[in-house]
């Protein structure tokens, strides 16, 4: 069975090239992206939080599944990496880019909860987990990426 997604966001090709030229290797794969789009589509007018924008591949997948009334907030510490996502995706009025440490952002955020929280960086996954879970609306979804075991056999206790 081939479970490769049949379609992808238009911006994805450019974002993958940008990731390659900047040696950014932590983007979500196509299967994860397809899941993100499906989860976003299941939340009409949903509020979506992405922790770890990276170059924007996950962001593009989320936007591809969201309806016009949905809103996405995406948080990234590395302004240079996030600039790639901003350049390609900021014309979409549904997305708000935040350049900040996701841990600090989680500590300071006092707005409404989110229907979908996608944690693709350390805060919200390995640190600040309880706070991230507190931001999931009742009936909402919390999803993490990149929890594969380390090749060194060590558990993921700190960023490398």
Task: Annotate the PLM regions.
Residues 1-116, 123-143, 147-160:
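A short alpha-helical cap/connector motif
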């Amino acid at each position: 069975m081939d479970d490769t997604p049949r379609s992808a966001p238009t911006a994805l090709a450019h974002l993958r090239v940008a990731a390659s030229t900047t040696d950014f290797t932590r983007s979500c794969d196509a299967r994860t992206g397809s899941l993100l789009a499906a989860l976003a589509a299941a939340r009409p007018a949903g509020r979506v939080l992405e922790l770890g924008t990276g170059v924007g591949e996950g962001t593009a997948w989320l936007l591809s599944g969201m309806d016009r009334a949905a809103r996405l907030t995406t948080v990234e510490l590395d302004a240079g990496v996030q600039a790639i996502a901003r350049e390609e995706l900021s014309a979409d009025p549904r997305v708000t880019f935040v350049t900040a440490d996701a841990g600090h952002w989680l500590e300071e955020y006092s707005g409404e909860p989110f229907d979908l929280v996608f944690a693709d960086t350390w805060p919200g996954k390995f640190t600040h987990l309880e706070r991230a879970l507190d931001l999931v609306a009742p009936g909402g979804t919390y999803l993490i990426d990149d929890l594969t075991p380390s090749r060194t056999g060590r558990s993921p206790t700190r960023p490398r």
